[in-house]
Amino acid sequence: MAISAAIGTPLETCLAQAVDANPALKDAAAVVAAVGRSAVEISERIGRGALGGDLAAAGDHNSDGDVQKALDVIAHESVTAALRGAPVAEVASEEAEEVMRLNPDAPLAVAIDPLDGSSNIGVNMAVGMIFGIRPSIKDPANPLASFTTPGSTQIAAGFVTYGPATALILTLGEGTQSYVLDRTEGRFKLTSPAMSVPPSTKEFAINASNARHWDAPVKAYIEDCQRGTEGPRDKDYNMRWLASLVADIQRVLTRGGVFLYPGDARKNYARGRLRLLYEVAPVAMLVEQAGGAATDGQTRILDIVANGIHERAPLVCGSTEEVTCVATYYAGGKPDAGRSPLFGQRGLMRS
């Protein structure tokens, strides 16, 4: 349900209100509360910085081959411990190779990235946590059954941004809300009961250093944005890139914009870098519930079915006009319309 509570209302009160309106959300609300408690604990560890030890220290490699930082492990252990006390049957985590079985008879499954943006740890930049809550499917013949359903089956989704303030962005399936951690009380409080992504924008977020590897539709779209009022987009754009998915998406949810992490020609990047279950699908639900859109360029994100828990997917999300425009480029629309022949031959991003 949409939250109607006043600004400053504690998360627990808002969750209780949602359950009163829709008792079917009782278990999901319990999971969100558990994640929130873990986020408070993780926020405290991050807030101590180097005084709490070298949180950026390298360790083993995770399921995707990334080097695990000390804080990756701390966050994973914290949230897993919290979820053991919640109605969660299984967890798919970025930091675990296989699905973790918690409470076999519980009704829910959680896909989670315990620490997004770990490359930012050592430089005091924003990091976060991303999660999606789904029904647990009891199928002995398919141990991945709970996670091989479309993203549209998610009951709730959210992320936490550990930045200047620690923020929780949450949807329970009707609207997207934001909460901020009140450090004096150690709990999250409502700051926006209805986040809304404007339909149009003049901002895009993409890692432009990979431009030479992009597929033609992405090159064409970004090139047209860079042409500003002289090009077919007919407006001047700004570029933003924080190298932290949660921070980039929070900006989109707060003031609009379009975020792109496409697949590209680099080895192992054909489907981008982001993981479908515990990064892309939760973000897509949050953005859609705030009035935006999310696609991989050709297919609505929430219609995609994962084949494995660490599967990747390209992501284009945010303001609907721009997301629709990018999809048009992918569909082979007319991205050359409005370009001068000279620019088409010598544009900065032409391969």
Swiss-Prot record:
GO biological process, one term: fructose 6-phosphate metabolic process
Record-linked PROSITE patterns: FBPASE (PS00124)
Keyword set includes Acyltransferase: no
InterPro entries recorded: FBPase_C_dom (IPR044015), FBPase_class-1 (IPR000146), FBPase_N (IPR033391), FBPtase (IPR028343), Fructose_bisphosphatase_AS (IPR020548)
Any Pfam family hit: FBPase_C
Entry superkingdom: Bacteria
Pathway of action: Carbohydrate biosynthesis; gluconeogenesis
Gene Ontology MF: a single term: magnesium ion binding
Annotated Gene Ontology cellular component terms: cytosol
Residues that, per the record, bind Mg(2+) 2: 113, 116, 279
Keyword set, alphabetical order: Carbohydrate metabolism, Cytoplasm, Hydrolase, Magnesium, Metal-binding
Keyword match Hydrolase: yes
Subcellular location: Cytoplasm
Cofactor note: Binds 2 magnesium ions per subunit.
Listed cofactors: Mg(2+)
Binding-site list for substrate: 116-119, 207
Family from the record: Belongs to the FBPase class 1 family.
Name recorded for this polypeptide: Fructose-1,6-bisphosphatase class 1
